[in-house]
Amino acid sequence: MALRLAVSSALRPALNSQVRNASSAVSVKDVLASAPQAEVTTLKNGFRVVTEDNGSATATVGVWIETGSRFENEKNNGVAHFLERLIHKGTGKRASAALESELNAIGAKLNSFTERDQTAVFVQAGAQDVEKVVDILADVLRNSKLEASTIDTERVNLLKELEASDDYHQLVLFDMLHAAGFQGTPLALSVLGTSESIPNISAQQLKEWQEDHYRPVRMVLSAVGGGVSNVSSLADKYFGDLSNEYPRKVPQVDGTRFTGSEYRYRNDNVPHMYAAFAVEGVGYAHKDALALQIANQFIGQWDVTHATSRTAASRLVQKIGHDHGVHNLQHFNINYKDTGLFGIYFVADAHDLNDTSGIMKSVAHEWKHLASAATEEEVAMAKNQFRTNLYQNLETNTQKAGFNAKELLYTGNLRQLSELEAQIQKVDAGAVREAISRHVYDRDLAAVGVGRTEAFPNYALTRAGMSWWRM
């Protein structure tokens, strides 16, 4: 999950250089402590505001909401994403065309997305237009005009999008991975919904979803950039009168449960095999979350377009980057609020079971190494790579705004980057070994494949290999 740091244009080159060089004179932690710090304000109604003024000429201001497909059921699956799409279609105050014209006039962009556990609506604009942006955000979130004709038009668009998504094999694969690993729980549901649920979502269901989920205690307004220092007072002006009264029951997440399982969708018209294997990971604020992130970095990723794998930083890439017919290889660590997925995704020719089994044997060998033999030198290298990716990705207003909002939604608190850096520094080889031993060794796997799956690795043998690590 991308984490990004917003710094002023004047500070950014110096910060990047100092972080990369990590000189003894100035520590990374000291550099980060000198960067702009985020401030958190909570309004009387529980609506939270986080601002980070970095003095830049632009700003990102958005509202992140604790909602998404994990709050849905099979009958209304896709309703959160459906509602998010309608936010762009006008309000009682601003028709769709007027909203678009108003944004264009100030050179602003309105964007939104829905994930399994959050919806975000945000605007990128000039620093001088921050109040206008907060006004627009409040209008689209509070006064969406859910007209029947607009809903029907968007329903058609969503069904087309759903059909087109079948061609995005990685997206299909990760939806299948959630469906297999979290079967019987709302985390198994796709954000997009299904061809059965979308046609039956009514205007009343959309209205009730907005009333139940767009409540102040479930929302965070996050602003990063220039001109955002007074956003907390603007939030009080435009969101301070929102109530926490629920006409129905308070939305809650049902308990999670991970199930070791296998699911294959064979389609020989797809030229390759797309595969993913994962154990249950940990929640965002779990004590082992950072250690698993660094372990994830240690294994790394590779693509066939890369010039070489023999000198790669990743041991796994060195072993199989040019063998076994691999086209793409990516280790992943997904964190939700209370659970996650830790595993490997790869694309391969899959002509031979020995090749595909060899891939998983190599992955299991790396997991074994991390659990029993990871060295301080290896972990230090992985931490440096993790830092580079982290701080590069934290350089835009938009991604830093998302990071700040997610911290509050998932943990109720906000870590400054200097605090996060201090936590990274504390992760040593022992912490990585213990985290992998606790969460990966002898754990059940969810295994899914799409495409040419005839040579899919044998599940029983792969699972048995998870408990043969210790000498």
Curated annotation (Swiss-Prot):
GO terms for cellular component: mitochondrial matrix; mitochondrion. Transmembrane segments: none annotated. Keywords: Electron transport, Mitochondrion, Respiratory chain, Transport. It comes from the Eukaryota. Pfam families: Peptidase_M16, Peptidase_M16_C. SUPFAM superfamilies: LuxS/MPP-like metallohydrolase. GO terms for biological process: proteolysis. It is found in: Mitochondrion matrix. One of its GO terms (molecular function) is metalloendopeptidase activity. Signal peptide: none annotated. Belongs to the peptidase M16 family. This is Cytochrome b-c1 complex subunit 1, mitochondrial. It comes from Caenorhabditis elegans. The lineage of its organism: Eukaryota, Metazoa, Ecdysozoa, Nematoda, Chromadorea. The gene is ucr-1.
